[in-house]
Design a protein with these regions (language model features):
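Short, well-ordered beta-strand elements within core beta-sheets of diverse protein domains
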Residues: 155, 223-231, 359-367
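Catalytic-core signal marking the mid-to-C-terminal active-site face
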Residues: 1-18, 55, 68, 75, ...
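Short amphipathic alpha-helical segments with heptad-repeat character
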Residues: 110-121, 128, 158-161, 165, ...
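A helix-coil-helix interface module used to build multimeric assemblies
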Residues: 1-184, 190, 194-200, 209, ...
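Acidic, glycine-rich loop-and-beta core segments that form the ion-binding/anion-interacting portion
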Residues: 198-291
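A structural signal for small-residue-enriched, beta-sheet-centric alpha/beta enzyme cores
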Residues: 189, 209-216, 345, 361, ...
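Generic, well-ordered alpha-helical scaffold segments in large soluble proteins
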Residues: 29, 33, 79, 83, ...
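Conserved hydrophobic residue
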Residues: 40, 45, 251-252, 370
Length: 435
């Protein structure tokens, strides 16, 4: 988590003060439940809240204690005792460190997911707006990077909209997966604490009780969460890569907004590079990389070890902060994307009508030619055009084999660009709904 790629809204979730505040709330809510069950005095639970609810925890002091104890939760509860006083002896009754750490981690992950869902909504709004602006803007579709058949630029953006809609649903599911709480004691048996304490804390923290924990919440939940972030990052990169290709000088169908005073190169003043898209490509690699340790964290020894801990202290903040930044950058990129319909049309025309070859093939078979013959007739006229030697429609009209099946007028009708877009409305309704 470095400032260059960090937004304050997401960073605040992972700040030490936020973490200690959540730790306190977990401990205090547990004390409330213990008090209701008669395990600790009710006045003690009230005092814990009264003394520390609005406290600013002394991070330097906690660090000082941890240097001696070598244990972060003990360092925190020791500092909490300094704030609360004698009633602090009722804090952490029957609990283990993982109850606090894991429940806190899941609170942070769910809060991060809420921000990421809002980020995706920004991307979706930008994509929808630009898709409708260019719903019928003709452009060339490419397979293997080579001209294939016409599409519209609106369809390109609609593809991305559908992908990010799926990403949103996956993230909602991943949020639910980690929205669990464990207050079950040393090895998850509730030997020293009533399960009703867990139920109370879970409700208070906006979580669900973990059905069965060991000393930790099972890490397959977290693996799914971080894998989902990795998939979303891949969707970010897919769209960024599309923009990078479209901005190449010889293509130039779309271009990142270039602001006044912006410089593209320290050496070449003419340069306008797709730096935002390239940046997103690199950030996506990092988010995907964080999914790997999350997968490996699933494999813990027996009821618990802490091999997961060091990894999670890094991947939790880094993955969510990085993806949050990337999604917001992507939304802004799409909102300001420069789109060049004239260049799209010029590129459509570059191959002299070859983009209609499949329609010619189908028409010939419908007129009685075998598919093999029709393919041969069309291809032998297409190849000279591919080499820049003539116009496709003109060559077809001179081909005696083609003329056996079709008139010049019938051939000409097959070069209608609008034919390829007759179902755009249907696709848009599928993607965006009837509205």
């Amino acid at each position: 988590m470095i400032p260059r790629y960090t937004r304050p809204e997401m960073a605040s979730i992972w700040e030490p003060q936020t973490r200690f505040k959540i730790w306190f709330e977990i401990e205090a809510h547990a004390a409330d439940a213990q008090a209701e069950l008669g395990v600790i005095p009710k006045e003690a639970a009230k005092t814990i809240w009264a003394k520390a609810r609005d406290a600013t925890f002394n991070i330097d002091r906690i660090d000082e204690i941890e240097r001696e104890t070598k244990h972060d939760v003990i360092a925190f509860t020791t500092h909490l005792a300094e704030i609360v006083g004698p009633e602090a002896r009722f804090v952490h009754q029957g609990m283990t460190s993982s109850d606090v750490l894991d429940t806190c981690f899941n609170v942070q992950l769910t809060r991060a997911a809420d921000l990421l869902i809002a980020d995706i909504d920004k991307v979706l709004a930008a994509l929808k707006k630009r898709a409708f602006e260019h719903k019928m803007t003709p452009t060339i579709g490419r397979s293997h990077g080579i001209h294939a058949e016409p599409v519209t630029f609106g369809l390109k953006l609609a593809y991305a909209y559908a992908e990010f809609s799926r990403a949103r649903e996956r993230l909602i599911a991943a949020r639910k997966e980690v929205a669990t709480c464990a207050i079950s004691g040393a090895v998850g048996t509730f030997a020293q604490i009533d399960p009703r304490v867990e139920e109370h804390v879970a409700k208070a923290m906006g979580l669900m009780p973990e059905p069965i924990s060991t000393q930790v919440i099972p890490r397959d939940r977290h693996a799914m969460y971080f894998a989902t972030l990795g998939v979303i990052a891949s969707s970010v990169e897919r769209l960024a890569t599309e923009i990078r290709h479209l901005q190449r000088t010889e293509v130039l169908e779309a271009e990142e907004f270039f602001s006044e005073g912006q410089k593209g190169s320290s050496a070449m003043p003419h340069k306008r590079n797709p730096v935002l898209s390239e940046n997103l490509t690199g950030l996506a690699r990092m988010v995907r990389a964080y999914a790997m340790p999350a997968m490996e964290n699933v494999v813990l020894w027996h009821e618990r070890d802490i091999s997961h801990s060091s990894a999670e202290r890094m991947i939790g903040p880094d993955a969510t902060v990085t993806l949050d930044f990337a999604l917001n950058r992507l939304a802004g990129l799409i909102e300001k994307l420069l789109i060049y319909p004239a260049n799209m049309q010029k590129n459509l025309d570059r191959l002299g009508g070859l983009v209609h070859s499949q329609r010619l093939l189908m028409a010939l078979t419908q007129k009685g030619a075998s598919r093999e013959d029709a393919y041969r007739f069309v291809q032998r006229n297409a190849m000279p055009v591919w080499r820049g030697e003539g116009d496709f429609q003109t060559l077809l009209k001179k081909d005696p084999d083609v003329k056996k099946f079709m008139t010049d007028a019938e051939i000409g009708e097959l070069f209608d660009l609008g034919y390829h877009f007759k179902h755009v409305d249907t696709i848009f309704k599928r993607v965006f709904g009837a509205s």
